[in-house]
Amino acid sequence: MSNIESIVEKLSSLTLLQAAELSKRLEEEWGVSAAAPVAVVASAAGESAAAVAEKTEFEVFLEGFDAKKKISVIKEVRAITELGLKEAKDFVESAPKSLKTGVSKDEAEELKKKLEAAGATIILR
């Protein structure tokens, strides 16, 4: 019996719990993820795969900010959210936090650009 066949035989005899443990250990050992890649299939109507997979709503997430530019970030958050000065300050200081949800891609990118120019660290989700 070859090495490959004996490995297949041993793996086939594992219980579900043992297989899950093996998967975790291999992920840690090799630094990879066992998550399956997501494949997008074009529909019969002829839609392109890019159009099907494109996200339409985004969340602007305040990850943090440059301490030297805190005042600029507070001003920008205040302008975007229409919060009062104290509320905007508290919001910025409580980062990481979601700033705005359900916005279009263009609006999210514009907000990100403004906030990063002010000194914030922004993630679009």
From Swiss-Prot:
Quaternary structure and interacting proteins, as annotated: Homodimer. Part of the ribosomal stalk of the 50S ribosomal subunit. Forms a multimeric L10(L12)X complex, where L10 forms an elongated spine to which 2 to 4 L12 dimers bind in a sequential fashion. Binds GTP-bound translation factors.
Purpose of the protein: Forms part of the ribosomal stalk which helps the ribosome interact with GTP-bound translation factors. Is thus essential for accurate translation.
Pfam families in UniProt: Ribosomal_L12, Ribosomal_L12_N
UniProt GO BP: translation
PANTHER family attached to this UniProt entry: 39S RIBOSOMAL PROTEIN L12, LARGE RIBOSOMAL SUBUNIT PROTEIN BL12M
Family as reported in the entry's similarity comment: Belongs to the bacterial ribosomal protein bL12 family.
HAMAP family given in the database record: Ribosomal_bL12
Name of the protein described by the UniProt record: Large ribosomal subunit protein bL12
A molecular function (GO) term: mRNA binding
Gene3D superfamilies named in the record: 3.30.1390.10, Single helix bin
SUPFAM superfamilies: ClpS-like, Ribosomal protein L7/12, oligomerisation (N-terminal) domain
UniProt source species: Liberibacter africanus (Citrus greening disease)
InterPro entries tied to this protein: Ribosomal_bL12, Ribosomal_bL12_C, Ribosomal_bL12_C/ClpS-like, Ribosomal_bL12_oligo, Ribosomal_bL12_oligo_N_sf
NCBIfam families according to UniProt: L12
Keywords: Ribonucleoprotein, Ribosomal protein
Coiled coil: none
Superkingdom of origin organism: Bacteria
